[in-house]
Amino acid sequence: VDRATTEDATRPTIVFLHGTVLSGAAWTAQVAVLGDAFHCLTPDLPGHGTAQDIPFTVDGAAERVHALIEREAHDGRAILVGLSLGGYVAIAVAARWPERVTGLAIAGATADPVGLQALGFRGLAVVLDRVPEPVVDGVYRWFFRLRFPPSIAEPIFAGGFSFAGGVVALRALVGEWFSPRLAAYPGPSLLINGEYDLFFRPTEPAFARAAADPRRALIRRATHLSNLDQPDRFSRLIRAFATRIGTNSGRA
């Protein structure tokens, strides 16, 4: 079941796509703030949450998001907001169906998982695959309780962690080029990274050069999970980006 807010058909749709291991519940803070003005959809990606029985592939995930936009988005179009794994899926959707995507915001996804960059993806997959699930689940729960307030952590716990699906997803990303896909999307894009996300920040300029109409944003005092570390700042960026798109398209 895809979580959604507001049935007002005049409100632009935003589809939020979560990161590896998490679920659509990772966007609870953004939906709470943005649901007043936007129709928000927070699907679980294949291999995760309610879709954990569906094997993850980049193309398969993109096709499911495209089908969701066709089925649920107002006017059959949406702004895509993706973090990490969700950012890569969002890029894939925008490249294949640009007419369905009015804007593209990606966070922590400005590196092609190839060559040396692929080592980080492979390494995390190995850890999640080899460490017993009860152990890694305990570590994740400890981390989220320590790092985030209950208003953020508890919905994530309720949505569940999908470690096996995360392993498959990480390995599916390896060897895939996403900057050319970003270049194929002619619409506006917003590239977001956390100040302390030193894995994705160095290659952000290359992604910005590839994008047709890019904007860049750095979220201070944030790591890779920028929407959770600084939820208010992240939400303000998305509201401003989405509002600008609506204004430029003649939609208030």
Ranges and model annotations:
Residues G82-G86, A90:
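Gly/Ala-rich beta-loop-alpha elbow adjacent to hydrolase catalytic centers
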Residues D2-Q52:
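Conserved HGGG/HGGXW glycine-rich cap/lid loop of the alpha/beta-hydrolase fold
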Residues L45-H48, A109, R221:
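Active-site loop/turn elements of alpha/beta-hydrolase fold enzymes
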Residues P214-A252:
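Catalytic active-site module of serine/aspartate enzymes centered on a nucleophile-bearing elbow/loop
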Residues I91-R96, V101-V131:
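Flexible "cap/lid" loop of the alpha/beta hydrolase fold
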Residues A32, P188-A222, L228:
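Conserved loop-alpha-helix segment in the C-terminal half of the alpha/beta-hydrolase fold
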